Curated annotation (Swiss-Prot):
Originating organism: Haemophilus influenzae (strain ATCC 51907 / DSM 11121 / KW20 / Rd)
Enzyme class at the top of the EC tree: translocase
Localization per Swiss-Prot or TrEMBL: Cell inner membrane
Main location: membrane
Protein name: Fe(3+) ions import ATP-binding protein FbpC 1
SUPFAM superfamilies linked: MOP-like, P-loop containing nucleoside triphosphate hydrolases
Underlying gene: fbpC1
Bilayer topology term: Peripheral membrane protein
Length: 328
């Protein structure tokens, strides 16, 4: 491990009875970065977070935080905080007491506690909310209180367990921007779990896609989307239309239609049978053109920006294309 490797999981396996849910997983998160675990339901992402937190014990393998082996350490001794989906706030306590609860358990004096609570609430744009109660604030504000409660402890590692799932679309967008801003400003090493790809892309330095207890690919969002390393990733990361083709000298032939692959040489793609994935935004509709494939519109769905249209090629394959709403 290098000095910059802050959170490290080595050869982690987790089994419940005979069911192996995490299969010999290796994971490294650099100091001060945020990494998101993304994947289909049941892929093991939440189990990984629980293992890091100390809420579950691995069947085998080791977990290191800042160079220290914490595999057998309790959650209290890992210097970790978790922001939950459910907020987990105490309704009988004021906002200030909720945020300061962990400090009180650590024996921090009243005066210092009040100052740190004040600073934490200012960080999440809730200055002056100390004396309010949970039922007096909105869901988005409650999630910011939960975030302040974690930040006030200044943990080595901050964990997020699908924290925005209970919020509406606009609140999710503003909260993910706030989470990313604070994580970068404070430099807290963070592990984030979500099923929302947009959310994962927005908050992360790197995204890890999991499936069946294994890491399928770890990369920045742009690389994951544009250069998936498998058919599973191509289908999972956004919409794709997948065609059988044959590659020769950087050009894929799809049933007689030629598609130049500009990255073929860079990645030393061999000639021969291949699968070609085409993103909806890479296709343009036109009445005619020299480089066009004749298609028939099967259906159109208005989604605001953009509009989705399902086309059928002359060879019977379905193709999804995005276009502007005025073309509806």
């Amino acid at each position: 491990m290098s000095n910059n490797d802050f959170l490290v999981l080595k050869n982690i396996t987790k089994a419940f009875g005979k069911a192996v849910v995490i299969d010999n997983l290796d994971l490294t998160i650099k100091r001060g970065t945020m990494v998101t675990l993304l994947g289909p339901s049941g892929c093991g992402k939440t189990t990984v977070l629980r293992l890091v937190a100390g809420l579950e014990n691995p069947t085998s393998g080791q977990i290191f935080i800042d160079g220290e082996d914490v595999t057998k350490s309790s959650i209290q001794n890992r210097d970790i905080c978790i922001v939950f989906q459910s907020y987990a706030l105490f309704p009988h306590m004021s906002i200030g007491d909720n945020v300061g609860y962990g400090l009180k358990m650590q024996g921090i004096g009243k005066e210092e506690r009040a100052q740190r609570v004040k600073e934490a609430l200012e960080l999440v744009d809730l200055a002056g909310f100390e004396d309010r109660f949970v039922d007096q604030i909105s869901g988005g504000q409650q999630q910011r209180v939960a975030l302040a409660r974690a930040l006030v402890l200044k943990p080595k590692v901050l964990l997020f367990d699908e924290p925005l799932s209970n919020l509406d679309a606009n609140l999710r967008r503003s909260m993910r921007e706030k989470i990313r801003e604070l994580q970068q400003r404070l430099g807290i090493t963070s592990l984030y779990v979500t099923h929302d790809q947009t959310e994962a892309f927005a908050v992360s330095d790197e995204v890890i896609v999991m499936n069946k207890g294994k890491i399928m690919q770890k990369a920045p969002a742009k690389e994951l989307y544009l250069r998936p390393n498998s058919l599973f990733l191509a289908n999972f990361m956004g919409e794709s239309s997948i065609f059988d083709g044959k590659l020769e000298n950087g050009v894929a032939d799809i049933n007689g239609y030629s598609v130049p692959l500009k990255d073929a040489a860079q990645f030393n793609l061999p000639d021969g049978e291949c699968l070609v994935g085409i993103r909806p935004e890479a296709i343009y509709l036109a009445a005619e053109g020299s480089d066009a494939q004749r298609c028939e519109i099967k259906s159109a769905v208005y989604m605001g920006q953009p509009l989705g249209k399902w086309l059928q090629t002359g060879r019977g394959k379905d193709l999804l294309v995005n276009c502007k709403p005025e073309g509806f």
